[in-house]
């Protein structure tokens, strides 16, 4: 279960900090969030898929680490991103 190229490009354009930004924490977190959302939907349809469940936990951990990094380096960007992605923090 991976995001197609068009979806990634759309997310990148929406969250990039400048024109050529493709790897900032903001973009990575947004892509991970979309991927997590898709995996959650998949797990609703296939609750016995343990490999996808483990992949979901791994992605959530990656996103959590990136969010912690962003919060420690630029709190204002962190708060803005949390609001834009409708995350619970």
UniProtKB/Swiss-Prot annotation:
Short name of any one Pfam family annotated for the protein: Ribosomal_S15
SUPFAM superfamilies: S15/NS1 RNA-binding domain
GO BP term, example: translation
Domain of life: Bacteria
Keyword annotations from UniProtKB, A to Z: Ribonucleoprotein, Ribosomal protein, RNA-binding, rRNA-binding
Gene Ontology molecular function: any one: structural constituent of ribosome
GO cellular component, one term: cytosolic small ribosomal subunit
Family: Belongs to the universal ribosomal protein uS15 family.
Task performed by this protein: One of the primary rRNA binding proteins, it binds directly to 16S rRNA where it helps nucleate assembly of the platform of the 30S subunit by binding and bridging several RNA helices of the 16S rRNA. Forms an intersubunit bridge (bridge B4) with the 23S rRNA of the 50S subunit in the ribosome.
Subunit structure: Part of the 30S ribosomal subunit. Forms a bridge to the 50S subunit in the 70S ribosome, contacting the 23S rRNA.
Descriptive protein name: Small ribosomal subunit protein uS15
Organism for this UniProt entry: Chlamydia caviae (strain ATCC VR-813 / DSM 19441 / 03DC25 / GPIC)
